[in-house]
């Protein structure tokens, strides 16, 4: 069965979702429609040439109301209200605008044909929050509006699951050192978050994140045990989670790393990776994993204080998981 999806919002995530589907060569998911308020010609150009991920791996052509990436024309519309979108024949609406992030707003896609909605962000009131590889098996046919969580929650959750299952996490605090994103300005300007009002490429910028707390939505056994902050840094892509936690029992660096390696080579293969090399952030650009654990950064103090580091391409890894989750939802239709 091939899942027919429509993408609402053709920005960083929307474009990368389409690219991930094409680049992977997968045939279990097909993009049949795109809705974005930008000009079709501009969207096609931004798809063809990407400053972070390079040129699109296939020929991109476009017309007045279509874009073709070598799999046939994809219908393109420019409609503001999701409830008015022509989604007849669409199995899954991928909500990628970053605007319709409550269940009530996202559910508007269901009014005109879409059978399910997958939101590319945390979504208040969603029927379920999914981190693929961690809890996608909990999906049911009754989950109409699903959140794909955030890129940071997708990085942290697989690591947290493995380590909690292996040694137990009593409590912990995460810092994500996160590349700047599209909601940050190139020069100082107005922003409701005064930290994010500052020029993205000129400073390290402390700000908030709900990613650690959101792990509790994915792994209920960790609810209330994790918190965190974000520091935005002057790089355009790739981020890293620095997690310090109190283990439930004494452990060692070797045990922590062995648990991660076993999961990465086993049940979480393709979602969780690991590296033993002296890598830096640019080495993980365009890496499709949700999380790449850095083995030589693991530290254990007095048996129970554990510190780990895990990298993630905050655009590409997340976009690949959007496709994975959409297919998992589609199998329940």
UniProtKB/Swiss-Prot annotation:
The protein's role, per its UniProt record = Catalyzes the oxidative phosphorylation of glyceraldehyde 3-phosphate (G3P) to 1,3-bisphosphoglycerate (BPG) using the cofactor NAD. The first reaction step involves the formation of a hemiacetal intermediate between G3P and a cysteine residue, and this hemiacetal intermediate is then oxidized to a thioester, with concomitant reduction of NAD to NADH. The reduced NADH is then exchanged with the second NAD, and the thioester is attacked by a nucleophilic inorganic phosphate to produce BPG.
Q: In which pathway does it act?
A: Carbohydrate degradation; glycolysis; pyruvate from D-glyceraldehyde 3-phosphate: step 1/5
Query: Per UniProt, where does NAD(+) bind?
Result: 12-13, 36, 80, 120, 314
Record's InterPro entries? GlycerAld/Erythrose_P_DH (IPR020831), GlycerAld_3-P_DH_AS (IPR020830), GlycerAld_3-P_DH_cat (IPR020829), GlycerAld_3-P_DH_NAD(P)-bd (IPR020828), Glyceraldehyde-3-P_DH_1 (IPR006424), NAD(P)-bd_dom_sf (IPR036291)
Its principal location?
A: cytoplasm
Write the protein's name: Glyceraldehyde-3-phosphate dehydrogenase
- Can the keyword Cell cycle be found in this entry's annotation? no
Which positions are annotated as binding D-glyceraldehyde 3-phosphate?
150-152, 181, 196, 209-210, 232
Record keywords: Cytoplasm, Glycolysis, NAD, Nucleotide-binding, Oxidoreductase
Catalysed reaction(s) here are: D-glyceraldehyde 3-phosphate + phosphate + NAD(+) = (2R)-3-phospho-glyceroyl phosphate + NADH + H(+)
Against Pfam families, the record matches this protein to:
Gp_dh_C, Gp_dh_N
Q: Which residues form the active site?
A: 151
Q: Which organism is it from?
A: Cereibacter sphaeroides (Rhodobacter sphaeroides)
What additional remark is attached to this entry? This protein is encoded within the form II ribulose-bisphosphate carboxylase operon.
| CDD domains xrefs | GAPDH_I_C, GAPDH_I_N
A cellular component term from Gene Ontology for this protein is: cytoplasm
According to its UniProt record, the EC number is 1.2.1.12
Which terms does the record give in the GO molecular function aspect? glyceraldehyde-3-phosphate dehydrogenase (NAD+) (phosphorylating) activity; NAD binding; NADP binding
Subunit relationships: Homotetramer.
Q: Which gene encodes it?
A: gapB
């Amino acid at each position: 069965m091939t899942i027919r999806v429509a993408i609402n919002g053709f920005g960083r995530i929307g474009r990368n979702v389409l690219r991930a589907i094409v680049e992977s060569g997968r045939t279990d998911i097909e993009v049949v429609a795109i809705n974005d308020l930008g000009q079709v010609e501009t969207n096609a150009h931004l798809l063809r040439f990407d400053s972070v991920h390079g040129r699109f791996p296939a020929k991109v052509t476009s017309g007045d109301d279509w874009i073709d990436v070598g799999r046939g024309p994809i219908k393109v519309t420019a409609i503001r209200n999701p409830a008015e979108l022509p989604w007849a024949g669409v199995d899954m609406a991928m909500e990628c605008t970053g605007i319709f992030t409550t269940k009530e707003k996202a559910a508007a896609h269901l009014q005109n044909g879409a059978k399910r909605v997958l939101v590319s962000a945390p979504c208040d009131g969603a029927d379920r929050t999914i981190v693929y590889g961690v809890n996608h098996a909990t999906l049911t046919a009754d989950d109409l509006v699903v959140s794909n969580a955030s890129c940071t929650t997708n990085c942290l959750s697989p690591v947290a699951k493995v380590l909690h299952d292996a040694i137990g996490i009593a409590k912990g605090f995460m810092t994500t050192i996160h590349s700047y994103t599209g909601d940050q300005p190139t020069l100082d300007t107005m922003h409701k978050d005064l930290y994010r009002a500052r020029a993205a490429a000129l400073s390290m910028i402390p700000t908030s994140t709900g990613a650690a707390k959101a792990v509790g939505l994915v792994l209920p056994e960790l609810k209330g045990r994790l918190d965190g902050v974000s520091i935005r840094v002057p790089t355009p892509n790739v981020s890293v989670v620095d997690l310090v936690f109190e283990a439930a029992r004494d452990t060692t660096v070797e045990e922590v790393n062995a648990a991660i390696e076993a999961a990465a080579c086993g049940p979480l293969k393709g979602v969780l990776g690991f590296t033993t090399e002296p890598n830096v952030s640019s080495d993980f650009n365009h890496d499709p994993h949700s999380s790449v654990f850095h083995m030589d950064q693991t530290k254990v103090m007095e048996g129970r204080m554990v510190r780990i580091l895990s990298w993630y391409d905050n655009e590409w890894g997340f976009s690949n998981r959007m496709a994975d989750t959409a297919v998992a939802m589609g199998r329940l239709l």
